[in-house]
Amino acid sequence: MGRWNPDAEGRLRAAALELFVERGYELTTVADIAERAGLTARTFFRYFADKREVLFNGSARLQQLMVETVNSAPKNVTAMGAVTAAVLATSEFFVDNRDFACRRSSVIAAHAELRERELIKLANLSRSLAEALNRRGVLEPDASLAAEAGIAIFRIAFDLWVQNAERRELGEIVHDLLARLKGFSVEA
């Protein structure tokens, strides 16, 4: 009998991404992913609802991190300050996963179904941030405006960060984009 290998979820994620890059998303089946990982399809479904979720299963943890960051921001911090802290917290979330994030991003970019899923996840994240700001006493439309601005910064920073030529850390890119955004609001 073979030796049990730990981290089934990680092995499934790695196998899925390898296969999505090698064969394409549409041509990869759950059975293919499980076989590559040395597991069964049944084991796959213990971790993921479907093959799309392999690419999106970190969304709940990311959302929790960002909402908790907004919730724990000091009371005197502005709505945008709390959202900025949440966006900056994402750099720690992704620090050890740059290679996975780069390959994941290219797979998503190549498939309309996955791009749509990504947009839905970002919209949910924005809504959660706005709700967290509401709980802090920030009224609408300010809460939604700050949340949407934060998600725009996050999305653009992430898109820049996963480019092969980009060498800066995610947090550095976020700071740069925030400075650019502030520059837009200065009247000439």
Where are these regions (language model features)?
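Hydrophobic alpha-helical bundle segments that form small-molecule/ligand-binding pockets
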Residues: 96, 122-147
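Basic, helix-initiating cap at the start of DNA-binding domains
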Residues: 1-23, 27-39, 56, 65, ...
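Small/polar (Gly/Ser/Thr/Ala-rich) solvent-exposed segments
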Residues: 118
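Short hydrophobic/aromatic patch on the recognition helix
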Residues: 39-48
